[in-house]
Amino acid sequence: MPKVALYNQNGSTAGDIELNASVFGIEPNESVVFDAILMQRASLRQGSHKVKNRSEVRGGGRKPWRQKGTGRARQGSIRSPQWRGGGVVFGPTPRSYSYKLPKKVRRLAIKSVLSSKVNDNNIIVLEDLTLDTVKTKEMAAILKGLSVEKKALIVTADANEAVSLSARNIPGVTVVQANGINVLDVVNHEKLLITKAAVEKVEEVLA
């Protein structure tokens, strides 16, 4: 079982903690991680693109000239696709780009990225993370004490308003709950700060 240091929020070591090998100690599967990221990014697409076809463009109800005798090509509407200002043929319409991977694949992906963080020594397990008041300066001091200088994902066991509000103005820092941890967030942040209680929740779900 992988063993990592356990820290308190002052940045001091408070011992070690053994992580579940089936969650934090597997061989990362890069292909599955790639598929999971594609799925998440597809779900983030707005999909509100829209163009008008010939029936939706304003005007064009009258035949521009008679069928025969003018020497010009026959036309039925000035909103036909070949006209300037006409409708678009087979243009984009509003749609959802989201799709779902199988549950086992999604679980393997999140286990893979968590294991990668352990392998790269980019995971910091905290005994607890509590703030009495909303104070960005205090949160910044905690991160500095833990030598977190780049993008960091903070994972708490439950909703913690003081932590979330204190961290939201710090560039590159994101706070999520254990039940909302996802592949894209973990990959997009160099450091993973997770509380001991959150580790237990993640292991309970994924082990």
From Swiss-Prot:
Belongs to the universal ribosomal protein uL4 family. GO terms for molecular function: rRNA binding; structural constituent of ribosome. Keywords: Ribonucleoprotein, Ribosomal protein, RNA-binding, rRNA-binding. Residues 48-89 are annotated as: Disordered. Part of the 50S ribosomal subunit. Residues 60-71 have a biased composition (Basic residues). GO terms for biological process: translation. This is Large ribosomal subunit protein uL4. One of the primary rRNA binding proteins, this protein initially binds near the 5'-end of the 23S rRNA. It is important during the early stages of 50S assembly. It makes multiple contacts with different domains of the 23S rRNA in the assembled 50S subunit and ribosome. The gene is rplD. InterPro entries: Ribosomal_uL4, Ribosomal_uL4-like, Ribosomal_uL4_dom_sf. Transmembrane segments: none annotated. GO terms for cellular component: ribonucleoprotein complex; ribosome. NCBIfam families: rplD_bact.
